[in-house]
Amino acid sequence: MKLKNFIPVIILLVNSLVLVAQEPARIPGEISIAFKAGNAAELTKYMNSTVELLLLDKSDFYKKNVAETVLKNFFVNYPAKDFIIRHQGAKNDAQYAIGILKTEKGDFRVYLLLKKVGQELLIHLVRIETENGN
């Protein structure tokens, strides 16, 4: 058999190995669990030292400890019932996720942006808005 007949098979095998070796971007499961529980203290463990919060009518950069208080107040006003990640991906050293936070007072769309700091993947942005985008 001629070598040129094997070339397409070899290319197919190499491409398959490359696809298997690439892991899909995943937000740490502990972050989803913390949102589902409405646990601001647990979320803080995965935050950068400064984080941008956009929560309904509030938008600012906060130090980690202040961000925890802001999120605690949000969860007091909107007790969490469930959190489901709808989409996630990655680009360069950043990962993102879009999820739905179900609360006792309605559903919210959550955007998360995580970036690598050293070897850790840390939350740099949390945006929570009403499900219809208003």
Question: Which residues does each PLM region occupy?
Answer:
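Hydrophobic residues embedded in beta-strands of well-ordered beta-sheets
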Residues: 51, 93-95, 121
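Surface-exposed, charged secondary-structure patches
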Residues: 69-107
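Solenoid-repeat scaffolds in large eukaryotic assemblies
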Residues: 42-44
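Short solvent-exposed beta->alpha transition segments
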Residues: 26, 47-84
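A mature extracytoplasmic/lumenal domain signature
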Residues: 47-50, 57-59, 87-89, 100-103, ...
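Short, aromatic-enriched amphipathic alpha-helices that serve as compact interaction elements
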Residues: 23-39
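Bacterial Sec-dependent N-terminal signal peptides
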Residues: 1-25
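Short beta-strand edge/turn micro-motifs at domain boundaries
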Residues: 107-134
